[in-house]
Amino acid sequence: MGFLKLIEIENFKSYKGRQIIGPFQRFTAIIGPNGSGKSNLMDAISFVLGEKTSNLRVKTLRDLIHGAPVGKPAANRAFVSMVYSEEGAEDRTFARVIVGGSSEYKINNKVVQLHEYSEELEKLGILIKARNFLVFQGAVESIAMKNPKERTALFEEISRSGELAQEYDKRKKEMVKAEEDTQFNYHRKKNIAAERKEAKQEKEEADRYQRLKDEVVRAQVQLQLFKLYHNEVEIEKLNKELASKNKEIEKDKKRMDKVEDELKEKKKELGKMMREQQQIEKEIKEKDSELNQKRPQYIKAKENTSHKIKKLEAAKKSLQNAQKHYKKRKGDMDELEKEMLSVEKARQEFEERMEEESQSQGRDLTLEENQVKKYHRLKEEASKRAATLAQELEKFNRDQKADQDRLDLEERKKVETEAKIKQKLREIEENQKRIEKLEEYITTSKQSLEEQKKLEGELTEEVEMAKRRIDEINKELNQVMEQLGDARIDRQESSRQQRKAEIMESIKRLYPGSVYGRLIDLCQPTQKKYQIAVTKVLGKNMDAIIVDSEKTGRDCIQYIKEQRGEPETFLPLDYLEVKPTDEKLRELKGAKLVIDVIRYEPPHIKKALQYACGNALVCDNVEDARRIAFGGHQRHKTVALDGTLFQKSGVISGGASDLKAKARRWDEKAVDKLKEKKERLTEELKEQMKAKRKEAELRQVQSQAHGLQMRLKYSQSDLEQTKTRHLALNLQEKSKLESELANFGPRINDIKRIIQSREREMKDLKEKMNQVEDEVFEEFCREIGVRNIREFEEEKVKRQNEIAKKRLEFENQKTRLGIQLDFEKNQLKEDQDKVHMWEQTVKKDENEIEKLKKEEQRHMKIIDETMAQLQDLKNQHLAKKSEVNDKNHEMEEIRKKLGGANKEMTHLQKEVTAIETKLEQKRSDRHNLLQACKMQDIKLPLSKGTMDDISQEEGSSQGEDSVSGSQRISSIYAREALIEIDYGDLCEDLKDAQAEEEIKQEMNTLQQKLNEQQSVLQRIAAPNMKAMEKLESVRDKFQETSDEFEAARKRAKKAKQAFEQIKKERFDRFNACFESVATNIDEIYKALSRNSSAQAFLGPENPEEPYLDGINYNCVAPGKRFRPMDNLSGGEKTVAALALLFAIHSYKPAPFFVLDEIDAALDNTNIGKVANYIKEQSTCNFQAIVISLKEEFYTKAESLIGVYPEQGDCVISKVLTFDLTKYPDANPNPNEQ
């Protein structure tokens, strides 16, 4: 049997660089402290054996490279190789390399694919998927805690039967589905057999029904022939009467034409005058608008001039203040220059005096060379004797110099502070002047602002009042327009409606008595509930304009085109062709004629209303409307109260979403008064709009007031800032500087006292040093003729010090005056720049004021000219209005003449209308009868034409499409008039009936007979007339279903066979593993327990298909009774889990077994038993590589591999190997030592 010989690792996890681990003995233990990298060694073995990355405790392959988890990878690659040794064969090397983000596999240094790599390992008994070669840390406890289902999953994984689970489920579903299909086709076949029997019975019933139906058809033909015959007789009679009346009307028309021509000429003249009047009104509006635009420009120009004048006054004051300040600053600078000249003069006089004194000195203490040498020697000797005193004096000198520097610094600071106080006083003076100037500007601005606010208030009140009134007018106009027009129309629609109303008023004024108005304005539903229904029936004709004649209609159309108005529909009363109202329809229950629920005024517009409504019926609900429309022998046009319309042709249209809004237009009352009110409100709106146009002037004033207010606000803010910030800050800084200046005196005095005190101490030291010098220089002083050596030394130095001190005083004075002079020069330049700037500002403002005054005069002149032009236009408008009124009076007289002639014509037209109505009704009746015959498939005997010549369009739908609809219906009637019916089949007795009562009686008799036959037919349940076709269809379906059933049965058999095959293969795999483990587990458990009384056994919950349910595992510990696995102690559970683990390994065992801390949960007794068992098995069955932390365990091994950590950026694992075979097991129980 082969074994794992060596492991070579390079940069894998905690193993940095290349390390060779091994050789591995048959029983090798891996030891080391926690965190040293023991488990990483097990991960390396798992890695080289093809384990997935997710099981190696990392997310990506790159994380396996040493240092990668902390962002410092040791290299860009890592590898692990394994040397596998087998008796009688050459060693083989298996390697896995991390290159980039992927793995590379090698066998004996040859790169191979993963599947080849896996196959070679499987040949050695190493199953990568089953992981039969290793046990991870904690796996023993996990196995001990598994429930039966989890144990089944473990066996599925080991036996690889789980690989077939997906295919097993798929085949099972296919088998179940095939069986269901078979069952379904069986029931379907059974049902179709029943249908075949039923179809035979239906065919017999259909034959009997057809015979009765033929008898009914013959009765229907007889009834329809009777109705049509008498209808044609009546139509011929009415046509003769109508021709006579039309001749009389033609004569009256010629008389009216002459009057109409005269009226037309007057209308043209009036139209021209009104256009001229409108043009003048347009020009007045334009001039008024122009004037409103010019006024704000004039106001703005005037305001700009006023503002610039105020600005100039402020600039002049600023110039005066700047000049005054400049003169004062110039005087201060002159004083400083005089003082500077005075100091320079005093310095020169001092220098001249010193020069004279130097020349006038007689005595000169000059030593000979030997005396100089002697002086230096004696000086050195004196220094040595007084060294201690000299050092002490030197220390005093250093301290004295430091204090003198402090004194000079304080005095310099005092001078600077005095200069700063002087500067602050000047700044305070400037602040106070600025405050005075700002207060003066604020007072002036407030006065201007009050004036602007007053003007703004007046304009605001005027504009707001105009706005409020405009809102009120608009609300009233909206209410009027809502009543006059559609409630949902938007502003554009309101404007459009207003335009249409204006045109309507114009044509009524131009054609009085000829133009009656819109249909909606001339009629009203009798009750509110009929509003929607009437709206639906009238449709587009609601807004149609009713005129007396076609000629008037064409004149109106021409006028509308000239005015560029929208297209309108006209209904000329002399042109419309209407059918008479069918009186029988008034007898129908649950329905009323639409024309009967409408009130109309004047009466002579009835023809237009008849044209729009036809014989339409209104019903309370949709069900009644549908029943009446299609339920009887004759179809009718009906409408429900909710607006649902049923056409004779079968078309049904529901109530549109805007139908209710349109229907609300019927609620308007006193339309004429509302129109007058609308005109009045429109005129008032124009006047108020003129006032509202002052809003531009108001905005200009508001803008100026806002600008002035903002300037005032900024000035007040500047004043407040100057007072509370600049002035207060300067005063505060001045006080602070004065306080500092007051503190300089005591500090300077303190320093002077310290210096004076130290001078006394230095004087005492000096006297002691002088005593030493006097002793040393006593003889030398006698030689040169001085009292002491200091007299000789000071004679030269004293004079020089006095001169230097005086010169320093002069330099300090010059420096101080120079600094002040430079400061004053800079301030003087700033003052001079301010004077220049204000001079330029004054000059610029004066030029701008001159320009602004000219601009103001120009605007005033334009306003005066515009006002004059406006007044001239108003005068023209009044004159033109008077001319229009005169022309209207002339036209009124002509219209009166035309009205008289029109009355005579109206009387004749009424008679014609009555005849035409009856004639139209008869034609409509004939059309409806023919249409009903065609719809009901009643074959009439025709001598000319065919049934296809009968139109299916509705005969009474004239109201739907205005004049074009009327022409269409007339063409239908004309086409149907060409159809000649053969009345040969009609009994002569029926033809001879003349009186209306006699005709009605005969018709009722025929109808009653037909009703009885239809009643018999209706009592018979309508059979399936296609029974024969159904019978043939059912026979075909039966054969088809039989074939499908047989095919489904074969598919089910095939699916079952496929399922049984995969089921057997899965069972064989699982059972082979299970039987092997179940056979070996008892023996292994006895060996682990070291007791033959121990028992372990496995049992499947489902013996037929064990992989579908759990596997029970029970053990009886030595010397104990049977207890469930959960009741075993921790050690007993671990031993039982190990027994199961080793038993599973015995099925297709791998050549080596890697275990990670399997002894973790074992006590000392069980550790020894498990270690001995592994040791025994490693000699013959498998190689064991165990990670352990317990000495009782790893001392049983043949070799040890020690892992220890080294610290770096991350843990670095190092390895030691130790061969225990060289050391016999002298103490098998280490605990006794």
From Swiss-Prot:
GO cellular component terms attached to this protein's record: chromosome; chromosome, centromeric region; cohesin complex; condensed nuclear chromosome; cytosol; kinetochore; meiotic cohesin complex; mitotic cohesin complex
Keyword flag tRNA processing: no
Residues modified to N6-acetyllysine: 648, 713, 1037
Effect of mutating residue 496 to C: In CDLS2; affects the affinity of SMC hinge dimers for DNA; mutated hinge dimers bind DNA with higher affinity than wild-type proteins
Effect of residue 493 to A: In CDLS2; affects the affinity of SMC hinge dimers for DNA; mutated hinge dimers bind DNA with higher affinity than wild-type proteins
Main location: nucleus
SMART domains: SMC_hinge (SM00968)
Record-listed Phosphoserine modification sites: 358, 360, 957, 962, 966, 970
Role according to the record: Involved in chromosome cohesion during cell cycle and in DNA repair. Central component of cohesin complex. The cohesin complex is required for the cohesion of sister chromatids after DNA replication. The cohesin complex apparently forms a large proteinaceous ring within which sister chromatids can be trapped. At anaphase, the complex is cleaved and dissociates from chromatin, allowing sister chromatids to segregate. The cohesin complex may also play a role in spindle pole assembly during mitosis.
Disease link: Cornelia de Lange syndrome 2: A form of Cornelia de Lange syndrome, a clinically heterogeneous developmental disorder associated with malformations affecting multiple systems. Characterized by facial dysmorphisms, abnormal hands and feet, growth delay, cognitive retardation, hirsutism, gastroesophageal dysfunction and cardiac, ophthalmologic and genitourinary anomalies. Developmental and epileptic encephalopathy 85 with or without midline brain defects: An X-linked form of epileptic encephalopathy, a heterogeneous group of severe early-onset epilepsies characterized by refractory seizures, neurodevelopmental impairment, and poor prognosis. Development is normal prior to seizure onset, after which cognitive and motor delays become apparent. DEE85 is characterized by onset of severe refractory seizures in the first year of life, global developmental delay with impaired intellectual development and poor or absent speech, and dysmorphic facial features.
Subunit structure: Forms a heterodimer with SMC3 in cohesin complexes. Cohesin complexes are composed of the SMC1 (SMC1A or SMC1B) and SMC3 heterodimer attached via their SMC hinge domain, RAD21 which link them, and one STAG protein (STAG1, STAG2 or STAG3), which interacts with RAD21. In germ cell cohesin complexes, SMC1A is mutually exclusive with SMC1B. Interacts with BRCA1. Found in a complex with CDCA5, SMC3 and RAD21, PDS5A/SCC-112 and PDS5B/APRIN. Interacts with NDC80. Interacts with BRAT1. Found in a complex containing POLE and SMC3. Interacts with RPGR, STAG3 and SYCP2.
Name of the protein in its database record: Structural maintenance of chromosomes protein 1A
Naturally occurring in which organism (per UniProt): Homo sapiens
Lineage of producing organism: Eukaryota, Metazoa, Chordata, Craniata, Vertebrata
